[in-house]
From Swiss-Prot:
It comes from the Viruses. Signal peptide: none annotated. The chain crosses the membrane at residues 200-220. It is found in: Membrane. Keywords: Glycoprotein, Membrane, Transmembrane, Transmembrane helix. GO terms for cellular component: membrane. Its main location: membrane. Glycans are attached at residues 4, 75, 84, 104, 170, 175. It is a single-pass membrane protein. This is Uncharacterized protein L448.
């Protein structure tokens, strides 16, 4: 259960929102529920008598969601005064962005529907009968869900990359340490070989000197 319509709008699916609205969860006075249901029945009768505004009727002229010709009464219909005007079919009587009460044109022509309803109940009643607004609302929710899923997937990818990069750093450090140790060993081996060579040269030199001394002594003794 949500404390206000804004929280429900951002966190609740479309059908669950409309279900909670129809049950009067957002009403300050629960006794208004029966009055709202009565208003909804009256609204149904009005729409049945006037199929132009009954979007479930086959006689209504539905506006495609792919076209950018659907507007909001509260923002764009101040100049429309005739319900029979062809322009009126291109407007939806609820502004979900600001959640304000319907425009006076709605109150004027449909007083039994909107005069006693809260703005939440009026929106719910309209969504129940208007395939266009329900489709738009569903499209908005789907876009929000898709955007959130993209953010979650991107976040997971970033975390995977971040977890993978330290392992590469550790591997690079271990390889560097191994190379350094091998270089040190090679240097030690080379230095040891040089020492042996030097010692061998010295020994050979001493032996040669001794042989020369012996030869010289023998020569002198003769």
């Amino acid at each position: 259960m949500y404390s206000n319509i804004t929280k429900a709008w951002h966190e609740d699916p479309v059908k669950e929102i409309t279900s909670k609205l129809s049950k009067g969860y957002f009403n300050a006075n629960k006794n208004n529920k029966f009055e709202n249901e009565r208003s909804s029945e009256i609204s149904d009768k009005i729409l049945d008598k006037n199929p132009k505004y009954n979007f479930l009727s086959t006689e209504s002229d539905l506006v495609s969601l792919t076209e950018n010709n659907l507007h909001l009464l509260s923002n764009n219909s101040a100049h429309i005064s005739d319900l029979n005007s062809s322009e009126f079919g291109n407007y939806a009587p609820v502004d979900f962005a600001t959640k304000i009460k319907p425009h006076n044109i709605s109150n004027k022509h449909l007083p039994l529907v909107s005069s006693k309803d809260s703005e939440c109940d009026f929106s719910m009643n309209h969504i129940k009968h208007c395939n266009i607004c329900y489709g738009r609302l569903k499209e908005l929710i789907n876009n929000k869900v898709s955007k959130k899923m993209d953010e979650i997937i991107l976040d997971n990818k970033i975390k995977q990359i971040q977890s993978f990069v330290p392992s590469l750093d550790n591997l690079s450090k271990s390889n560097l340490t191994t190379d350094q140790s091998m270089n040190n060993q090679n240097r030690n081996t080379i230095s040891n070989n040089d020492l042996w060579k030097t010692a061998l040269i010295i020994i050979i030199g001493i032996v040669i000197i001794l042989l020369l001394i012996i030869v010289m002594i023998k020569t002198v003794c003769k």
